[in-house]
Regions:
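A short, conserved structural fragment
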Residues: 254-265
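Short acidic, hydrophobic short linear motifs in intrinsically disordered regions
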Residues: 223-236
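Active-site helix-to-loop segments that bind/position phosphate- or nucleotide-bearing substrates
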Residues: 1-110, 118-120, 126, 131-143, ...
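Long, low-complexity, charged/polar intrinsically disordered regions in eukaryotic proteins
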Residues: 157-205
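Short, cationic-aromatic polyanion-contact patches
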Residues: 264-278
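Glycine-rich/acidic phosphate-handling loop/turn and adjacent ATP-lid/helix
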Residues: 123-158, 199-218
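Short amphipathic alpha-helical interaction segments
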Residues: 89, 239-252
Length: 278
């Protein structure tokens, strides 16, 4: 809030965006409320559920995450003691994608709002605005926020952090479930991040295999390590008997100038690979 000359107080746009009970009460902010849409199947033909979250981000963020998680398909694990369910999607990645869409949106673009679209096989999180950093360097780039005050307040409210680790965590969570890495698509005035459910290696499109391989190399590099045939097999859950699959993917990634050999003089069996920019 800000104190006016007449002694009264006014609510700033930032205060309303975070703490408003209803964003529609503020002319410029009504379209900034996040929407969550659940579709039937894998296309947009039939909408099953649609929910706008009209409260300020600080009030409704956790509710958005819980609502989205509740709509995600899950697996039931039955053992002798109890029944448990596990999501088919990497939940830490879902949370990070939602937080990023709120923090990094371009608030000056009118007629557009952050949106989460849920399909049977993927989640698409879209926000107005394009990335401030090169997509290929999204893992190792220092943090850069479009809305510094918004990001700072959300960090103080423990909704996010400003350490630039969001994408690291998103990719690691996907790797833990053998899911493809989050796909980034940049359009003229918006950015879309797609998270995929569990998928067999043979069913992953080649473009997503290459992107996952590249981001795995980036993660290994910033940890002081390097991508190997074994680490890539572990990342995708490929058995050792199918090591030729990971070898072909590495060769393809080299051909696309995504990764390169660390030491060309190393024996092929012990070859290590790093991102092309390293």
């Amino acid at each position: 809030i800000q104190k006016q000359d007449n002694g009264l107080y006014s609510i700033t746009n930032l205060g309303a965006l975070l703490f408003a009970k209803d964003l529609n009460e503020f002319a410029r902010l009504g379209r900034k409320a996040m929407r969550v849409v659940k579709y039937k199947g894998i296309n947009r033909l039939l909408i099953q559920k649609e929910e706008p979250f009209n409260q300020g981000y600080a009030i409704c963020f956790e509710n958005i995450v819980r609502y989205v998680n509740a709509l995600l398909p899950s697996n039931e694990d039955v053992n002798a003691v109890q029944l448990s369910t596990t999501s088919k999607f990497p939940l830490p990645s879902v949370r990070e994608a939602i937080a990023n869409s709120l923090i990094h949106q371009d608030l000056y673009i009118t007629g557009a709002a952050p949106m989460v679209e849920i399909f049977d096989n993927r989640i698409e999180v879209t926000n107005p605005g394009t990335p401030l950093v090169d997509v290929l360097r999204i893992i190792d780039n220092p943090p850069k926020s479009r809305n510094e005050k918004l990001a700072s307040l959300m960090r103080r409210l423990k909704m996010c952090e400003e350490l630039g680790r969001g994408w690291d965590r998103m990719v690691l969570a996907c790797e833990a479930q053998y899911s493809p890495a989050p796909r980034i698509e940049v359009f003229q005035d918006s950015t879309k991040v797609t998270l995929f459910s569990e998928m067999e290696f043979s069913n992953i499109p080649m473009e997503d295999k290459l992107w996952s391989c590249y981001l795995h190399a980036c993660l290994m590099y910033i940890q002081g390590d390097a991508l190997t045939n074994k680490s890539l097999r572990d990342r995708f859950g490929i058995p050792e008997t199918s090591s030729s699959s990971s070898s072909r993917l590495i060769k393809e990634a080299i051909g696309k100038n995504l990764i390169k050999v660390l030491d060309p003089n190393t024996a092929p069996r012990y070859m290590k690979y790093i991102p092309i920019w390293a």
